């Protein structure tokens, strides 16, 4: 039985091509993935992300529990609504999932985790909650939309009440606010400005339709993938999984090593890996010649082989880009090779980010 989001009928009405995405019937595109991609880079596009898992963690020990559960430190979060990106690790230091945590108070947090990892995430959190005075509550009564692009905020504002407009006015990145029926957050997965909006299921279709009426372009999973890859954002299951350390997945910046007495799950393993300095790293690859870089292609370097984790043709740049896990000695600016159709093709090593706010950043 395939799951359907609350917006499923809207996708069909817009002529979406639907695919099975980890048990969810989701739109891959509405006709042209490239046009949808460009809409987000130049104007405004919207995505149904209601398949994502929303989990509220509440109770006297909520803060202590999350300080143990994830590699970033929720103690940093002092302003209600502030959010952070982090990873949840197993005891071996592998990434169970990446997620966003919103802080409401020391006893009230909201987590947004991936849909493909929902069952194992909830099981892991429940297992780790033993001894903590908390409740873990999934929130399936909400849908979620991402409205992204340089004109996204202005177009969303046309749908908001005066109170909601005032609440989000000047809101910095990685903040969220509950105002009226909507939870509006300045987060996203595209490298563009915009909002992710959590909306009650019973008003999700109406909200989607009003955005359509404002000229916001519906976008599918195809454009979502090319946009996130241009922005250098990881996709769980490709760029990292339970066998991969955050140190090897461009997630080291999300690890809060201080204070040293915070015993987060996987800390001992990461500390040893950091000291050894032998973890591979995630870099960007650029191929300006013909050809498309793809996941699992072998990367050949003088320090040993690596592997492309995510690769695609970049509609914004007009050539192929990829994320690849390579030996740590490989440096930005190096020329290395990728095996393509039994040939070795030269590629340039860059930082793992290619486009932000519509502009090339490498």
UniProtKB/Swiss-Prot annotation:
<dbReference type="InterPro" id="IPR029043">
    <property type="entry name" value="GcvT/YgfZ_C"/>
</dbReference>
<dbReference type="InterPro" id="IPR013977">
    <property type="entry name" value="GCST_C"/>
</dbReference>
<comment type="function">
    <text>The glycine cleavage system catalyzes the degradation of glycine.</text>
</comment>
<dbReference type="Pfam" id="PF01571">
    <property type="entry name" value="GCV_T"/>
</dbReference>
<dbReference type="InterPro" id="IPR006223">
    <property type="entry name" value="GCS_T"/>
</dbReference>
<dbReference type="GO" id="GO:0004047">
    <property type="term" value="F:aminomethyltransferase activity"/>
</dbReference>
<keyword id="KW-0032">Aminotransferase</keyword>
<dbReference type="GO" id="GO:0005960">
    <property type="term" value="C:glycine cleavage complex"/>
</dbReference>
<keyword id="KW-0808">Transferase</keyword>
<dbReference type="GO" id="GO:0019464">
    <property type="term" value="P:glycine decarboxylation via glycine cleavage system"/>
</dbReference>
<dbReference type="GO" id="GO:0008483">
    <property type="term" value="F:transaminase activity"/>
</dbReference>
<dbReference type="Pfam" id="PF08669">
    <property type="entry name" value="GCV_T_C"/>
</dbReference>
<protein>
    <recommendedName>
        <fullName>Aminomethyltransferase</fullName>
        <ecNumber>2.1.2.10</ecNumber>
    </recommendedName>
</protein>
<dbReference type="InterPro" id="IPR027266">
    <property type="entry name" value="TrmE/GcvT_dom1"/>
</dbReference>
<comment type="subunit">
    <text>The glycine cleavage system is composed of four proteins: P, T, L and H.</text>
</comment>
<dbReference type="InterPro" id="IPR022903">
    <property type="entry name" value="GCS_T_bac"/>
</dbReference>
<dbReference type="GO" id="GO:0005829">
    <property type="term" value="C:cytosol"/>
</dbReference>
<comment type="similarity">
    <text>Belongs to the GcvT family.</text>
</comment>
<dbReference type="InterPro" id="IPR006222">
    <property type="entry name" value="GCV_T_N"/>
</dbReference>
<dbReference type="InterPro" id="IPR028896">
    <property type="entry name" value="GcvT/YgfZ/DmdA"/>
</dbReference>
């Amino acid at each position: 039985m395939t799951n359907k989001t609350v917006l499923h009928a809207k996708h069909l009405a817009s002529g979406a091509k639907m695919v099975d995405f980890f048990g969810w019937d989701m739109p891959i595109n509405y006709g042209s993935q490239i046009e949808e991609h460009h809409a987000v880079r130049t104007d405004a596009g919207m995505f149904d992300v209601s398949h994502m898992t929303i989990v509220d963690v509440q109770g006297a020990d909520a803060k202590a529990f999350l300080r143990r559960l994830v590699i970033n430190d929720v103690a940093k979060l002092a302003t209600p609504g502030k959010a952070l990106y982090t990873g949840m690790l197993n005891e071996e230091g592998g990434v169970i999932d990446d997620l966003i945590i919103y802080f409401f108070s020391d006893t009230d947090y909201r987590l947004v985790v991936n849909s493909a990892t929902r069952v194992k995430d909830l099981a892991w959190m429940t297992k780790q909650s033993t001894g903590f005075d908390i409740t873990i509550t999934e929130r399936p009564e909400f849908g979620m939309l991402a409205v992204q692009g340089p004109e996204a905020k202005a177009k969303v504002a046309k749908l908001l009440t005066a109170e909601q407009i005032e609440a989000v006015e000047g809101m910095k990145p990685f903040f969220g606010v509950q105002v009226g029926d909507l939870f509006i957050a300045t987060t996203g997965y595209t490298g563009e400005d915009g909002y992710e909006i959590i909306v009650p299921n019973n008003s999700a279709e109406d909200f989607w339709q009003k955005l359509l009426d404002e000229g916001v372009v519906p976008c599918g999973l195809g454009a979502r993938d090319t946009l996130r890859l241009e922005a250098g954002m990881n996709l769980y299951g490709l760029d990292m999984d339970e066998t991969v350390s955050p140190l090897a997945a461009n997630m080291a910046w999300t690890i809060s090593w201080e204070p040293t007495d915070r015993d987060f799950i996987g800390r001992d393993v990461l500390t040893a890996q950091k000291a050894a300095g032998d973890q591979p790293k995630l870099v960007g690859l650029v191929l300006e010649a013909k050809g498309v870089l793809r996941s699992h292609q072998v990367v050949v370097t003088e320090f040993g082989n690596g592997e492309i984790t995510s690769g695609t043709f970049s509609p914004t740049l007009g050539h192929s880009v990829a994320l690849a896990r390579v030996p740590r000695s490989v440096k930005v600016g190096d020329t290395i090779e990728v095996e393509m159709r039994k040939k070795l093709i030269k590629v340039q090593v860059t930082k793992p980010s290619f486009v932000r706010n519509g502009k090339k950043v490498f």
